[in-house]
């Protein structure tokens, strides 16, 4: 499989835990696919961010969405503002349209268009991040058609570079220094922006590097038992812990493993 689109996800926070017996094999399968899929270039996994903003959910609570091997997609309106249902979080890579999306309908009586909203009842509208993720999967297919030699990490980086940043959102600048002599714009709603098919394909056509699971480099820092209490969150001010990595790396992902004992998770 070159591209795996996943318009689904776990509902309860922390329920899809890759360290648990139930989901350990799922992560092993993802790792196998990024290491061996497409003859070692890696399968591209695309996941919906989810439609649970109202309940306070966050993609950081779900290992399928926050894994470095996956591309997590949020949903925006046609007016380029975030959809009210789209689950936020720092693990979102990009976004695509999540309402008013025209697609083929189910056949027969299972169809969603029985009242004839369209002259041809084979089509209907659908919405949600289940609609936005397949658009990104389709764009990834166009990227691979333009350049079959892209590694799965190249695909992620190209989407990072090529997504557009509408002025309908507020943006933060990350610490990168390899994009227009500065950092990337990012926010927790749209990721690095709204996916741009033309820009992504054009970038893929001229892309020279090949970043795969086999040339990925890691650096790690370990902190001992902090023996600290977590205060109630007031004005979004929490605890601040810092560590330093001395290796000279281009950082693509940061993974934090933490063991917290608390009466309430989430």
Can you annotate each of these PLM segments?
Residues 2-107, 158-164:
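Catalytic-core segments of hydrolase enzymes
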Residues 2-4, 99-190, 194:
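Hydrolase catalytic cores
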Residues 50, 186, 194-265:
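Secreted peptidase-domain scaffold signal
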Residues 93, 138, 199:
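Alpha-helical scaffold segments in soluble metabolic enzymes
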